[in-house]
Amino acid sequence: MQITRVLLLPFSLLALCGSAQTLSITHARVIDTITGQIRRDTTVVIDGNRIARIDPSSKSVPKAAKIINAHGQYLIPGLWDMHTHVYFDRTAADGDDLILPLFIANGITGIRDMGSKLDAVLNARDGVASHRLFGPRMIVSGPMLDGPKSQYKAAIPITTPEDGRKAVDLLKNRGVNFIKVQSGVPREAYFAIADESKRVGIPFEGHVPDAIRASEAISSGQRTFEHLIGIFEASSPDETGYLTGKKSPGLFLASYDPAREATIIELLAKQHVWQCPTLYWERGQWLVDVIDYSKDPDLAYAAHTWVDKLWPQSQQSILKSLDTDPVAIRERFVSHELDVVRKLHTAGVPFLAGTDTPAGVDVIPGISLHLELQRFVAAGFTPLQALQTATLNPAQFYNKLDEYGTIQAGRLADLLLLKANPLTDIANTRSITAVIADGRYLSQGDLNRLRSRLRRSAVMK
């Protein structure tokens, strides 16, 4: 019976949100994610999965519309998590039944998946698009390209340049949206991957591999840097040694050179290389022995196998790699990361909000994106700028400003209603009263029922 309940969950969730319809959200406070201005007492009319028009609430609404009175509430675009691994190393059912619905339950209506099993993630992307599966819009890489000794199940091991070219061709032909490179890709294979990606017309993004300088990744056309990898190495006179040697927070801090840091920041800004720093995940990695996830108030949404097995295993594995750096050094490095993000932002380097969920300890899908926005504010972003990393910026990154990222007529109807203003406190992005995903409306009651089902699903995983 337990198996039957799990398998039936996606179908019951689809029934929960119904289909797109004509909606009129009246008396809302609509936040402009470009300027930060708020249009008060505004009606947003949705027809199907598109915003049809935006008017003062004094104007009449379509007679057939379902009316949602949003008096006193704030309307923002749906959020994007730009670094996820939905089908990373467990069964497809975990992604279908728990991870994807958790995104919607927390207002994440779009994700960039940075490494998952190929068939599972392609099926999910297409299933969500056709409303056969309950979840956010998905931009996917399929499996990562990693080195010959990759530890990941959702990776293609690469040894030679020819391996790299073949992998790019395979993934391009299967229909992935971009290529993800991991840290272990060998040097010559990396350049082959970059060259082949350009040749076949597919973006490549991800880690700056251990064998590659940040400047080389930039000149090769790598579109994003994840986790700030490459920047710390480039900020040190020991950068060449880091290509083949050990790295650690203590070593990075000891060899830090502000002038070299300024040089790499200037280059990143000039070439407009997007950064997805995963700050919440980073803090959890470096302080894994300090943070007590058992006290997380949202722990009920984490699969019990994550909590009981995977997270303790990850803790031990991470601690083994950190045994030479005391907590005080690692705390300094976490602060240093925030300072680097502040400098990058001041220089005009563009940012995307991402979490690496469900990889990492206590990085719960959906919930962690809100915590990531709070880390951006801790790094010196205004609440509006932090909000932009999960709304406006993903749309700019994909050249889709005509589709999402703002609330305007003609845009896709991916929206959140909030009780409180996120521009005064970014934590208010969690005060969700309704989610509209591809035109499908989930009320507060629907969300409460969804979250209850997901807590039950987490127990069974």
Q: What is each of the regions a protein language model found here?
A:
Residues I99-D119, G135-P143, L170-V185, I202-E205, ...:
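Divalent metal-dependent hydrolysis catalytic cores, especially in the metallo-beta-lactamase
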Residues Q73-R132, P148-Y152, I156-E162, E188, ...:
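Metal-associated gating/positioning segment near the N- to mid-region
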Residues V30-T43, P56-S57, S335, I364, ...:
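Acidic, glycine-enriched loop/beta-strand segments at the rims
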Residues L7-A15:
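Bacterial N-terminal signal peptides
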Residues L170-V185, I231-A379, R455-K461:
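Active-site neighborhoods of metal-dependent hydrolases
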Residues A28, V44, N49, G72, ...:
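Divalent metal-coordination and catalytic microenvironments
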Residues G18-T22:
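Boundary at the C-terminal end of the N-terminal hydrophobic targeting segment
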Residues V30, I34-I76:
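Histidine-rich, glycine-flanked metal-binding segment
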